[in-house]
C-alpha cells in the first residue's frame, strides 16, 4: 500500500477498519502533492468532533478517586481520544509533507503504527469494563 493511501484512509475514514488498517508493507513511490488541511478528520459515529458541540463536557478524573473499573475506564477514554488524535495528526503530516526526507516519513509511519496499537489497546480494555469509545465528549 502507498503511504499516501494509508494516510488518507486514516485521516478521512469514518470506520474503525479504516482508522486501524493494518500495514505490514508499504511503498512511498507516489507521495503526491502537499495536502490542504481539512476542517476536521473523518471519525466513527459518536466520535466526530462536530458531534461534541452542545454536550456536557466531563472533567478529567482526580487520580485519587479512581476506585471503580468504570471510573478507570472513563480515564482510559480520555487517553484513547489523545491517541486517536495523534494517529490522525501523523496521517496529516504524511499528507502535508510529501517531499519530506524518506527517513522522516518512515519514522512518521512507525509512529502512526504505534498510535494505532495504542488505540486498539485502549479500546479493548474499555470494552472489557463497559466503557464505549465515544460516550464522553
Where are the regions that the model predicts?
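Non-heme di-metal
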Residues: 1-137
Amino acid at each position: 500500500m502507498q503511504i499516501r493511501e494509508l494516510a488518507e484512509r486514516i485521516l478521512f475514514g469514518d470506520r474503525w477498519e479504516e482508522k486501524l488498517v493494518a500495514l505490514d508493507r508499504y511503498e512511498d513511490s507516489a507521495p503526491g502533492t502537499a495536502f490542504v488541511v481539512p476542517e476536521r478528520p473523518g471519525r466513527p459515529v459518536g466520535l466526530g468532533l462536530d458531534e461534541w458541540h452542545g454536550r456536557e463536557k466531563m472533567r478529567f478524573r482526580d487520580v485519587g478517586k479512581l476506585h471503580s473499573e468504570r471510573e478507570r475506564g472513563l480515564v482510559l477514554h480520555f487517553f484513547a481520544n489523545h491517541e486517536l488524535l495523534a494517529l490522525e495528526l501523523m496521517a496529516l503530516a504524511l499528507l502535508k509533507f510529501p517531499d519530506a526526507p524518506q527517513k522522516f516519513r518512515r519514522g512518521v509511519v512507525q509512529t502512526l503504527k504505534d498510535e494505532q496499537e495504542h488505540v486498539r489497546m485502549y479500546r479493548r480494555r474499555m470494552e472489557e469494563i463497559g466503557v464505549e469509545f465515544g460516550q464522553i465528549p
